[in-house]
Curated annotation (Swiss-Prot):
<dbReference type="GO" id="GO:0004106">
    <property type="term" value="F:chorismate mutase activity"/>
</dbReference>
<keyword id="KW-0584">Phenylalanine biosynthesis</keyword>
<protein>
    <recommendedName>
        <fullName>Chorismate mutase</fullName>
        <ecNumber>5.4.99.5</ecNumber>
    </recommendedName>
</protein>
<dbReference type="GO" id="GO:0120284">
    <property type="term" value="F:tryptophan binding"/>
</dbReference>
<keyword id="KW-0827">Tyrosine biosynthesis</keyword>
<feature type="binding site">
    <location>
        <position position="77"/>
    </location>
    <ligand>
        <name>L-tyrosine</name>
    </ligand>
</feature>
<feature type="binding site">
    <location>
        <position position="145"/>
    </location>
    <ligand>
        <name>L-tryptophan</name>
    </ligand>
</feature>
<feature type="domain" description="Chorismate mutase">
    <location>
        <begin position="7"/>
        <end position="262"/>
    </location>
</feature>
<dbReference type="GO" id="GO:0005634">
    <property type="term" value="C:nucleus"/>
</dbReference>
<dbReference type="GO" id="GO:0009094">
    <property type="term" value="P:L-phenylalanine biosynthetic process"/>
</dbReference>
<dbReference type="GO" id="GO:0046417">
    <property type="term" value="P:chorismate metabolic process"/>
</dbReference>
<keyword id="KW-0057">Aromatic amino acid biosynthesis</keyword>
<dbReference type="GO" id="GO:0072545">
    <property type="term" value="F:L-tyrosine binding"/>
</dbReference>
<feature type="binding site">
    <location>
        <position position="148"/>
    </location>
    <ligand>
        <name>L-tryptophan</name>
    </ligand>
</feature>
<dbReference type="InterPro" id="IPR008238">
    <property type="entry name" value="Chorismate_mutase_AroQ_euk"/>
</dbReference>
<dbReference type="GO" id="GO:0000909">
    <property type="term" value="P:sporocarp development involved in sexual reproduction"/>
</dbReference>
<dbReference type="Pfam" id="PF01817">
    <property type="entry name" value="CM_2"/>
</dbReference>
């Protein structure tokens, strides 16, 4: 899909300054999508297989909408982009557009944490971030905005997936800058040391501080900052990054690097 990074130029795609810009841009995207989602209650029913009756289907409403969205978007090349990873790869179809000519940017790998992202989103992130609406229970299909909530979920999940899997670009860039160091760590199979080598605690703290400021700023009506109240729980957004987004990104980076030597002169 459209991106601030020129993925047709491998050198630009692996420039850490460009990657950082894209990750900051994705913070905006994720925050705005979450603000849209918290207009609605949790609506647990839409995550239960069969909770909403769908003809000839036994999956949840959210999974159904996510799968069919990916099916449609695959026709316009979304998943030909090296920074996009589907939750339902078997649903993808042949694009109606001619393929884009992407250079080889990433080393061949099969790292995909979408199932974990989806599980954490449904079980942990949403319950923490969705308002209680006076503690009311899910009132059912005819009284709740199930379709709108699930549509927002699709946008949130796709943005989170893209942000987390962008760790591959970070890992490849770091590998190319410190090849000898990472080759030794990879050959030793030392995931802990690799994790420490890719971690910058100061940068992570800046990310969390910036994200909290964005959630507070974007979630406040500038015309009525005192009367309107926050649109989203700032702490919950920050906690989401601290507990899930950053750790899962590092899992992607480490597992990508563990496969980085396959088929190379270092294998």
């Amino acid at each position: 899909m459209d991106t601030a990074i020129d993925l047709s130029d491998a050198s630009k795609a692996l420039d850490l300054a460009n990657i950082r810009f894209q990750l900051i841009r994705l913070e905006d995207t994720i925050t705005f999508h979450l603000i849209e989602r918290v207009q609605f209650p949790l609506n647990k029913t839409i995550y239960i297989p069969g909770g909403v009756k769908i003809p000839n289907e036994q999956i949840s409403l959210m999974d159904y909408l996510l799968r069919e969205t990916e099916r449609l978007q695959s026709r316009v090349r979304r998943y030909q982009s090296p920074d996009e990873y589907p939750f339902f790869p078997s649903a993808l179809e042949k694009p109606i557009l001619q393929p884009l000519d992407y250079p080889k940017i990433l080393h061949d790998n099969d790292v995909n944490v979408n199932e974990t992202i989806k599980t954490r989103y449904v079980q942990d992130i949403l319950p923490a971030i969705c308002p209680q609406f006076g503690g009311r229970e899910d009132r059912g299909e005819t009284q709740e905005n199930y379709g709108s909530a699930a549509t927002c979920d699709v946008s949130c999940l796709q943005a989170l997936s893209r942000r987390i899997h962008f760790g591959k670009f970070v890992a490849e860039s770091k590998f190319q800058k410190e090849t000898e160091k990472f080759v030794a760590l990879i050959k030793a199979g030392d995931r802990k040391e690799i994790d420490e080598a890719i971690t910058d605690a100061k940068v992570e703290q800046k990310v969390l501080e910036r994200l909290a400021l964005k959630a507070k700023t974007y979630g406040t009506d500038p015309g009525f900052p005192e009367q309107s109240g926050p649109k989203i729980d700032v702490q919950a957004v920050q906690d989401m990054y601290k507990e899930y987004v950053i750790p899962l990104t590092k899992v992607v980076e480490v597992e990508y690097l563990m496969q980085r030597l396959k088929g190379t002169q270092w294998e």
